[in-house]
């Protein structure tokens, strides 16, 4: 038994050694190249800047000058000098400036090997070693500029920006400070952090996004996790997401198989939810209206004690409905073949708020005072 173990360990050690030797040899033969290019352009309030990149980062900084500076660094690594020369011929930056439009685009001429390059770059980014291609942009712009950014297999870093912003990012990280203008943000297989937003349209898939304050968000998402501190108006179209919202004034939209958690709700909601769950930890007194249509969606509402509410709850015969044990007046009646309807008031005094729930299928509904 001991001899067998000894042989097994020797064999394993030999296999590891044989695996490491070619890697070491390959690394020692790597050939590298670095090229840098810069361009400078005048800018006005009507100017739009567009950057399209692959395999690297885009960093946008603001300055006080009425001009745009674009600095691009290209890092290349190959296993032989001839392959490196081929790679140098294949990759360059294309600059275009026409009137009020400025564009810098990463060009990769050898499209025949495009898929293999992208797959290899994904592996390189994940391991952090042996990167074949890395193209990084550092851009300096006036804060009022409109900016369009597209990046694949890389990151985007944003300073404060007051102009319109359009971001399309896949397989990377977005880190932005204050985005004050209208914006459109598409994230796919990405992570993002935004300190504050004005009005934005978001398309988020297979991503994690954390946001601070926002004025108005129109969000289409799937298989993502969204954290948001505060928003005035939020519209969602959600599939298989997890939402964590700290403070929401107006909440509208649709969801399927999503979990929605709101800590502080202020004013109005209109939601249509299939499967999943909705929890509102604190519904402020004096809210205007809450409407939720639930199709196999569990609901938990926790009310501030000063709330005065008219309620109308349609619930399936297999649904479980729990209403407050105090400050409640309710009547229940049969509504159709499979449903009951509970109507009445919650709280003390003349109602000023409206709560309506249509629970079409089996679910759990819990409403209580805090």
Please tell me what each predicted stretch does:
Residues 2-370:
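Intrinsically disordered, low-complexity terminal regions
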């Amino acid at each position: 038994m001991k001899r067998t173990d000894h042989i097994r360990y020797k064999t394993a050690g030999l296999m590891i050694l044989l695996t490491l030797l070619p890697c070491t040899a390959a690394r020692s033969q790597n050939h590298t190249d670095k090229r840098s290019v810069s361009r400078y352009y005048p800018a006005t309030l009507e100017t739009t800047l567009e950057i399209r990149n692959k395999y690297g980062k885009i960093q946008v900084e603001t300055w006080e000058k009425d001009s745009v500076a674009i600095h691009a660094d290209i890092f290349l690594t190959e296993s032989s000098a001839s392959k490196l020369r081929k790679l140098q011929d294949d990759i360059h930056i294309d600059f275009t400036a026409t009137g009020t439009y400025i564009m810098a685009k990463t060009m990769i001429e050898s499209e025949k090997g495009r898929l293999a390059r992208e797959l290899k770059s994904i592996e390189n980014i994940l391991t952090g070693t042996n990167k074949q291609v890395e193209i990084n942009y550092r851009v300096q712009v006036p804060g009022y500029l409109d900016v369009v950014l597209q990046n694949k297999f890389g990151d985007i870093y944003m300073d404060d920006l007051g102009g319109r912003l359009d971001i399309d990012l896949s397989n990377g990280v977005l880190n932005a400070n204050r985005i004050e203008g209208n914006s459109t943000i598409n994230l796919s297989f990405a992570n993002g952090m935004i300190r504050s937003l004005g009005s934005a349209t978001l398309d988020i898939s297979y991503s994690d996004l954390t946001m601070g304050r926002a004025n108005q968000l129109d969000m289409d998402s799937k298989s993502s996790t969204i954290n948001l501190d505060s928003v005035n108006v939020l519209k969602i179209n959600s599939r298989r997401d997890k939402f964590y919202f700290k403070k929401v004034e107006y909440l509208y939209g649709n969801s399927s198989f999503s979990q929605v958690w709101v800590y502080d709700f202020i004013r109005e909601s209109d939601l249509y939810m299939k499967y999943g769950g909705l929890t509102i930890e604190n519904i402020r007194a004096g809210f205007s209206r809450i409407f939720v249509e639930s199709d196999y969606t569990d609901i938990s509402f926790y009310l501030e004690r000063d709330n005065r509410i008219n309620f109308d709850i349609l619930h399936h015969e297999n649904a479980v409905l729990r209403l407050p044990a105090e400050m409640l007046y309710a009547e229940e009646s049969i509504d159709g073949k499979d449903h009951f309807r509970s109507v009445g008031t919650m709280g003390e005094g003349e109602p000023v708020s409206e709560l309506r729930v249509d629970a079409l299928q089996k679910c759990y509904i819990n409403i209580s005072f805090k």
